[in-house]
Amino acid sequence: MTGKTQTSNVTNKNDPKSINSRVFIGNLNTAIVKKVDIEAIFSKYGKIVGCSVHKGYAFVQYMSERHARAAVAGENARVIAGQPLDINMAGEPKPYRPKPGNKRPLSALYRLESKEPFLSVGGYVFDYDYYRDDFYNRLFDYHGRVPPPPRAVIPLKRPRVAVTTTRRGKGVFSMKGGSRSTASGSTGSKLKSDELQTIKKELTQIKTKIDSLLGRLEKIEKQQKAEAEAQKKQLEESLVLIQEECVSEIADHSTEEPAEGGPDADGEEMTDGIEEDFDEDGGHELFLQIK
């Protein structure tokens, strides 16, 4: 946001003057950083003639080469939107420095020999292959600065004479590892044995409690059975007594009834009748005496 008129998008002029005053900005987070932001950052080094923003990189065209080199020296490796910028002169691509284990891409070898180096993208023409390959080369170099994670060392083949020593070394290592594993296994077995003993103690305590409860239940059952038998005997004895009393009462009643209605009673009735006859007739006694 400089307040100046907006610069053009043309940064692809092929004259030597414009190429030498052109700055390449790589590793740019174009999703966040816009053209206005780039112009605001780089306008302090000199007048900007053109600025073109692409996906992941951008170009800034200055009026003079001195301004472009000042921008490269001042803004290279600056962190914007979480990414360090890779800034270089567009006319002087970063020289390729081969590293051990890395191969140079074929596109970098045949970049200058392309028959169709200029393509039309977004309404204007620029050397796409040249800057794309140069940008990715710089990007790979930047990522190559970060040390890779350590890789497992593959043992080289040795002659048969040294095989015995390696086997012995392996044997010693395996024995050491075996001792460590046995030590860890012994500690684990000790822990397991302690846990088993505690569980065994708890189980024995539970068993004793259950046995005591069962004994109490048996005692209660025996007491209940004894009480039930005693009650049963009492009921039987009471029933027998009641039966005996009933039988004795019946026998008493049967013996008392014939005594009341026997011969004495008939004699009394007869005498009573005689007396009545005697009283009524008056002289009946005399008649009996005469007889």
Curated annotation (Swiss-Prot):
Sections of the chain in a coiled coil: 190-249
Keywords noted in UniProt: Coiled coil, RNA-binding
SUPFAM superfamilies recorded: RNA-binding domain, RBD
GO molecular function per UniProt: identical protein binding; RNA binding
GO cellular component, as recorded: nucleoplasm; nucleus
Low complexity composition-biased segments: 177-189
Biased composition range(s): Acidic residues: 257-282
Disulfide cysteine pairs (residue numbers): none
InterPro entries attached to this UniProt entry: hnRNP_C, Nucleotide-bd_a/b_plait_sf, RBD_domain_sf, RRM_dom, RRM_HNRPC/RALY_subfam
The UniProt record lists the keyword RNA-binding: yes
Chain spans, region Disordered: 171-192, 249-291
Expressing tissues: Widely expressed, with highest levels in brain.
UniProt domain RRM: residue ranges: 21-92
Top-rank lineage group of the source organism: Eukaryota
Family from the record: Belongs to the RRM HNRPC family. RALY subfamily.
The protein's name in its UniProt record: RNA-binding Raly-like protein
Taxonomic source organism: Homo sapiens (Human)
Lineage: Eukaryota, Metazoa, Chordata, Craniata, Vertebrata
